[in-house]
A protein has these predicted regions:
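Repeated loop/turn-to-beta-strand initiation elements of outer-membrane beta-barrel proteins
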Residues: 61-68, 108-116, 161-166, 201-207, ...
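Extracellular loop and loop/strand-boundary signature of outer-membrane beta-barrel proteins
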Residues: 38-41, 76-89, 129-143, 176-185, ...
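Transmembrane beta-strands of outer-membrane beta-barrel pores
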Residues: 39-45, 58, 72-78, 105, ...
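Detector for outer-membrane/organellar transmembrane beta-barrel domains
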Residues: 138-216, 224
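Flexible, glycine-rich linker and terminal segments associated
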Residues: 6-19, 177-187, 192, 204, ...
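Solvent-exposed loop/turn segments connecting transmembrane beta-strands
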Residues: 41-50, 62, 75-81, 89-95, ...
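Residues that define the transmembrane beta-barrel architecture of outer-membrane proteins
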Residues: 46-52, 91-97, 112, 147-151, ...
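Residues on the lipid-exposed face of transmembrane beta-strands in outer-membrane beta-barrel proteins
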Residues: 52-56, 99-103, 153-159, 193-197, ...
Length: 341
């Protein structure tokens, strides 16, 4: 065969989505329920954790999917003397949850996937000692178990080479709570954008910017950067490393692992086209699900007990008597003041 005869065949391997056969894929075959396990090491305001998750397509169209993505993780203790929330060590064990309701769709030639999602995350948190006290062989007192929660929203766009992810995390409910006699903890609002690039079919890298802020004493407003590198070892098994920096948490390095069953629905003949980043993105788990917590160094003081006395003189049978009445005002559990150290 001449070189000219080979050119059309070569072009089909590196051409458009239609040339690659993506247009022939039936999404009902590619978009199915999948579930699996995930785990992560502690990061900037996030715990050591491992759990189970699942992706459930509620409705699959010709070019779209309406879905629920849910996770439940067991949260473990921080490394001793290395707090994930800056000062107070997180103690195990609690169970956090995350749920997303979303819609993803392909453009007309299936070269891009777009998505929108929103949901709710919860995080109970037990507290241990504080790093500064551990170094001095001391201990904080009145350690509390607290509960934080947030609502979240995200936007996605994925092509064969590029991926974009914008997200917002918005704490709700009691966003600041007493952790112990020295520290107050608060859930952080976080807004971010990640831009990723598929280096090879197995390697994916991204760089992101985020802005975080809290309420009152745990404000810690800060701009941050997040670099991520992921490697797909086999179908469904992915390892990742993450490096972040901001003024509140400074540099944090963490790792993550994820395995999903039910991701190999295509036949071997279809496997190459079915596993393109655009088609795979339709069933990937939504990113940025953790309730991020930061603590602040404060002195928790009970309101002082106050005794108020009144004296009244009365005349009884021609004799004067003085009667003293005292009222004591005591502290209630909510009567606490917080002052910066």
């Amino acid at each position: 065969l001449s070189n000219a005869a080979l050119l059309p065949a070569i072009a089909q391997d590196v051409g458009s989505a239609e040339d690659l056969g993506v247009m022939e894929i039936n999404l009902t075959d590619a978009v199915r329920f999948n579930w699996g396990f995930q785990g992560a090491l502690q990061g900037a305001g996030t715990p050591n954790q491992a759990g189970i998750g699942g992706f459930l397509p509620l409705s699959v169209g010709d070019n779209s999917v309406f879905f629920v993505d849910a996770l439940a993780n067991v949260n473990f203790s921080d490394r001793n003397g290395d707090s994930s929330i800056v000062n107070t060590d997180v103690a195990g064990t609690t169970i956090s949850t995350s749920t997303r309701l979303g819609y993803r769709w392909l453009n007309s030639d299936r070269s891009w996937m777009y998505g929108v999602n929103a949901g709710y995350d919860s995080r109970p948190m037990n507290t241990g000692n504080a790093d500064a006290f551990i170094r001095d062989a001391k201990s904080v007192s009145d350690r509390q178990s607290v509960f934080f929660q947030q609502i979240a929203a995200g936007l996605e766009a994925v092509s064969e080479s590029w991926n974009f992810n914008a997200y917002g995390l918005f704490p709700v409910g009691d966003t600041e709570q007493v952790l112990n006699d020295h520290y107050l903890g608060g859930a952080l609002s976080t807004y971010g954008l990640d831009v990723g690039y598929a280096i090879t079919p197995e390697w994916d890298a991204s760089i992101g910017y985020y802005y975080q802020h809290g309420d009152d004493l745990t404000a810690n407003d800060a701009n941050g950067v997040l670099a991520q590198l992921g490697y797909e070892i086999t179908d469904g098994l992915t390892l990742g490393v993450n490096v972040s920096y901001d003024e509140a948490f400074e540099t944090r390095v963490s790792g993550n692992i994820e395995y999903r069953f039910g991701t190999g629905n295509a036949t071997e003949v279809e496997k190459k086209t079915w596993q393109t980043p655009v088609i795979q993105a339709l069933t990937e788990s939504v990113k940025h699900r953790d309730v991020r917590v930061h603590d602040a160094n404060v002195k928790v003081k009970e309101v002082e007990v106050v005794q108020v006395c009144t004296t009244k003189t009365i005349k009884l049978f021609g004799k004067k008597e003085t009667k003293k009445t005292c009222t004591t005002y005591t502290t209630t559990p909510t009567s606490k003041t917080y002052t910066e150290q």
